């Protein structure tokens, strides 16, 4: 029998697939490599299973040819880049996506089912590998089960209820009608994915060696369950107004069963979500917490905490009780820029190295320094960031005032960041996450990796007549006067001698997400619950101290005062606070697209007019709130069908029992 190396086999199995037969598997092997050879031994089986991950796109692909619409399909991003170049989030909001032409979004359907088919082949044939020990078999099957569950999870995020194949191995010689089947209900889908992840977690390791960073762990399985349970408890899937409006008349045509229960609210779902989050929070490694928020200790460049904060009695205590003793800008920023060691970041419940994120830094980088300069943030995002003492821009203090007139008089330096003199006062005195994420006119760009004169330590502006302004390009400019800089390291450069970029990691699940989902879930409880997950039972209730403890870890890490009992006075008040916090904390991580949908506020947020600075003006009239002068603003489509993506029409027509998503063509 032919010897197949891990590298060759993995590369073959990770190749892109173009077949329309979404339940075929043999199409993906050349005549040189037979499926029987895969199960000849342990080594080949391992390579085969890891080859499945090649079907799943780099999760850090947020903007271009992405599996999900991402930031460009929300109120956190806008661009003038041509949609023909794969900016399909813009295609979606401009009404250019259809079931007959879903562009890259069809990848979720085709590649996920390719992955599921492969996993089922492993379940059916793994015993053919005679050199597997019982432990080998258990570990490989757990990994296989996780990958299959993750593929179903991606399908659920994109389309809602899925077609469940179970463990059935699908031969490639079946006629189309032999594998036609209806979609499961939403409840059946969620329960199946979660049960599969629970089973997978039993034999997944808690950690891997550093060289194997990115492989799914027990915590990754538990973290996915926590996210799925939180989404499932949210209004879109749990009797909210959006559920009734979007899914009230959505019945399975094969038996007239409703896909989504829209007329009943189940509070216990929030309790299960809270317990699932708590399980991740309780995980230990050598007696210490398995996961924690990433922090950097303060040093001589760390600015002092803001004075006069009285709303949070713990604020001046050392972190994690309060906000003292850490550098808030670096603690947030360095896990995205590549400064932090990706493989040892304790905040990654599950993460992977992402070359796409490295490449995407070019989208926010100034065009005059080798970038494309057009991945814009909106004024809404800029306004959402608090002042340095945690107050909103509408309620700023005398010590840290907010102003939309005038410019700063002196340069400030803090945490390795330089805030130039002459910066618009709107951008002064803001919280540290603002400086980590927002590129604005008169921002200082270090670009320290290059040694070429004039290519580093530069100030960039977006005035109409500046080198990075609108007059220089029809598409490669910021239509709002802001760009995303969250993933850009001070050393990163795209032009000049020795220009290079730091490696980046993409957090598929961050511990900050677990903490905020936990706080959110507890907030919606009106009584105490005892929830059993595996062998453990978790007691959950709307305990104000528990909510504050989890939520304030995130707040204090960013240098902001924690919430008070007044903020928790009622469920709705805290929900609004949490929505803003998630918008800031997870900016351009792909979370907001799903958040506004699960909360049922997608239409509300999308109906708000995109605004920014006046990029048609020179410096004298640039600094005024303006609707970008582009037809794309008026062309934005807001429709309830956009809560879910369309299943590709060619797949729907091959499967007569499979219903299309509401309001999409079938």
Where are these regions (language model features)?
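Conserved, well-structured interaction surfaces
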Residues: 37, 42-60, 82-159, 176-218, ...
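Membrane-proximal, proline-rich intrinsically disordered regions
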Residues: 20-70, 297-298, 425-428, 650-666
